[in-house]
Amino acid sequence: MTEIKTIKKRSGFRVMAELIGLVKPLSGYMCLAIFAGLIGHLCAAFITILGGYAVLAVLGVQDKITPMQVFITVPLLALFRAGLRYGEQSCNHFIAFKLLALIRDKVFRALRRLCPAKLEGRGKGDLISVITSDIELLEVFYAHTISPVAIAFLFTLILCGFIGNFHPLLGLLALIA
């Protein structure tokens, strides 16, 4: 009697967790990407926030920062934002392409072991094309999903804390929203 192995269907969450687990050897680059992205987003947010402070200063409502300080700080924040964005994207794509090379290597090594005849004959181009296109889809996940989600989470917490400095209920309302 032949034994038939059943393949367990994995949930999308489990697959995503396993894909994230592959990043572990490159976690330093991932932390750098998250840090650069977070600081860059804070720079972008504070361009607008400081503009609001400048308006309030002109109206005489606040005196913590002068309009001249805002006019000096805003262009610097914009320059920092540009450099940090570049750094974040560079780290994300470095991670993505390193992992794609690793995954491709593992997949093709397994294919050579499991079905060497299929890789020699007709249709090998179709098989390789399908596998390569599937692996390429992972680039989006590694370069454009993991760190942006972490950045959004941390950015939200920081800005809710900032808003909460004005009044704790405002910070809580921002967090709920």
Question: Whereabouts are the PLM-identified features?
Answer:
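Surface-exposed charged/polar residues within alpha-helices that form helix-capping/stabilizing sites
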Residues: 20-21, 57, 161-162
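Alpha-solenoid HEAT/Armadillo repeat architecture
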Residues: 21-25, 60, 143, 147
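Transmembrane helix-loop junctions in multipass membrane proteins, especially transporters and channels
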Residues: 61-62, 90-97, 160-171
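Membrane-integrated ABC transporters
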Residues: 1-43, 64-70, 88-92, 96, ...
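Short, hydrophobic secondary-structure boundary micro-motifs
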Residues: 31-32, 66, 119-121, 140, ...
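Hydrophobic alpha-helical transmembrane segments of ABC transporter permease domains
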Residues: 35, 39, 43, 47, ...
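Transmembrane helix-loop-helix hairpins at lipid-water interfaces of multipass membrane proteins
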Residues: 30-84, 164-169
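Juxtamembrane helix-loop junctions of ABC transporter transmembrane domains
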Residues: 12, 44-52, 77-120, 124, ...
